[in-house]
Amino acid sequence: MDHGQLSMMADKFQWVFSEPLLNACGTEVKFCRRQRIITPFRLGLALTATCASQPVETLADFHRGFNALWGTTITYKAFYNQVAKSRFADFARTMTSRLIGEMTRKVLGFVKGRAFAEFRHIILQDGSSFAIHDGLREVFPGRFKAVKPAAVELHTTMDLLCDAPTTVVLTPDTTNEQAFLPEPASLRASVLLADRGYLDLHYLRRVQEEGGFFLIRAKAGMNPQVVEAFREDGKRLRSLRNKPLKAIHATLPKRQRVELVVEWQVEEHPLRLRLLISWNRQTKEFCYLLTNLPAKRYPLDMIYRAYKWRWQVEVV
C-alpha cells in the first residue's frame, strides 16, 4: 500500500470513527437520548480498540478498556447498564456495518485477459458453529443437543478481491445456512465459492439466470442425467453418457479425475452444469465440485486450484 492509499484509509478511519457520526448513530437507533460520560462515540471507539489490542473474554475486559482509553473511573454497573440496553445491539451492528463498508477496498486482482479477470467480485461463503453456555439453549439451540445444547453459527460472506468480509450474521446453530447466501442478482459478473451445505439447485438456477457464476462443493447421492463424460486426460467416456449418475457411479475412474456434463430439471427448466469428480484415497470416497464456469476458459485443473481460495474465509 503506497502513501496515497494509506492517507486515504486514514481519512476514512477518522470519518467512520468521528465523534459527530457515532453520536448521531447512537441517537438514530435510539441507543441514547442524553449524552453523558459514556457517549456512543466513546463507547464505540473503546469497544473497537479493546477488541483490536487484547483478547476479550468477559464484559469486564471492555469495561477496563473504556476506562483506560478515556481516563475515566466509570463503575462496572454504570457501564453494564449501557451495554445491556436493547438498542445497544442496533448501535454496534450499524457501527460495524459502516466500518466494514467504508474500510473495504480492492487489494487483489488478475491481469486483464487472464482467467477470473472478468469478474467484479469473487464471493466466498461459509458458516462456522461455536458452542456457548448451556444456559442459552432456549435462545440459541444447537443442532447436536447431546453435545452442544446451546450453539451459534457465524455466517460470513467475503469478497476475495477485497480480502475482507462484506456480511457477517450471528444466528442460532439450527438456522438454515442457505438463507444467508447472497441475492442472485448481486452475483452478476461475479463468482460464488461455497461448501456443500449451501447446495440448492433452485438458487443456482437463479444465479445463472442473473448472469452469475458459481463453484460449489456438491453432495454425494445426487442423481442428475449425465450428458457427456471426459477423463482428465481428455478421453471421452462414451459408456457413461446418457445415463443417470447413480447408474454409472460404480464405474467412475479413480486414478484420474472426471468431468461430467450433467442436467437436472429445475422448476420445469433444464439446468445443465459441469460436475467434476475426484477420488479421495484417504477417505475412500468421491469428492464433487459443481460449476457453470465455461470449460474452454476454465479447464478442470484450474477449477480445482480455484476452489482452494474458499479456505480464505475460514481464517477470517
Language-model features, listed with the residues they occupy:
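Primarily marks folded extracellular/lumenal domains of secretory and cell-surface proteins
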Residues: 104-111
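Single, function-defining residue in the core of a domain
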Residues: 1-59, 65, 74, 78-81, ...
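Long, low-complexity, charge-dense
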Residues: 71
